[in-house]
């Protein structure tokens, strides 16, 4: 890969209301998705809005996983930005789809930091 990272933008539709409105559960699911991807968690912050909705981010040594939920519409927006090519984004997305009960997922992936170095960039940053 001749890019510093991958940015996956995923939209989860027809999700379970109770699941995506529970900030503790959403955080647990996001943290597990990080583990399944092979990324390294540094810190997470999640917030529940009133009357509904959750936003949160998991900072990983490889970049971040972020989520915003709209339970009233059964919808979640997820960003997974990871550096290097050793992280399994698909494993994370498959787990999120299952746990959110999503019946329809749309995914766009783009390379970030495309550099003309003439070599593949194989790395997995190590957090402090």
From Swiss-Prot:
Pathway: Amine and polyamine biosynthesis; S-adenosylmethioninamine biosynthesis; S-adenosylmethioninamine from S-adenosyl-L-methionine: step 1/1
Post-translational modification: Is synthesized initially as an inactive proenzyme. Formation of the active enzyme involves a self-maturation process in which the active site pyruvoyl group is generated from an internal serine residue via an autocatalytic post-translational modification. Two non-identical subunits are generated from the proenzyme in this reaction, and the pyruvate is formed at the N-terminus of the alpha chain, which is derived from the carboxyl end of the proenzyme.
Pfam families recorded: AdoMet_dc
Cleavage (non-hydrolytic), annotated site positions: 62-63
Keyword field contains ATP-binding: no
Keywords of the record: Autocatalytic cleavage, Decarboxylase, Lyase, Polyamine biosynthesis, Pyruvate, S-adenosyl-L-methionine, Schiff base, Spermidine biosynthesis, Zymogen
GO BP terms, alphabetized: spermidine biosynthetic process
Enzyme class: lyase
Entry GO CC: cytosol
Active-site positions on this chain: 63, 68, 83
PANTHER family: S-ADENOSYLMETHIONINE DECARBOXYLASE PROENZYME
Description of how the protein assembles with itself and partners: Heterotetramer of two alpha and two beta chains arranged as a dimer of alpha/beta heterodimers.
Recorded family membership: Belongs to the prokaryotic AdoMetDC family. Type 1 subfamily.
Chain's role: Catalyzes the decarboxylation of S-adenosylmethionine to S-adenosylmethioninamine (dcAdoMet), the propylamine donor required for the synthesis of the polyamines spermine and spermidine from the diamine putrescine.
The protein, known as: S-adenosylmethionine decarboxylase proenzyme
Gene label: speH
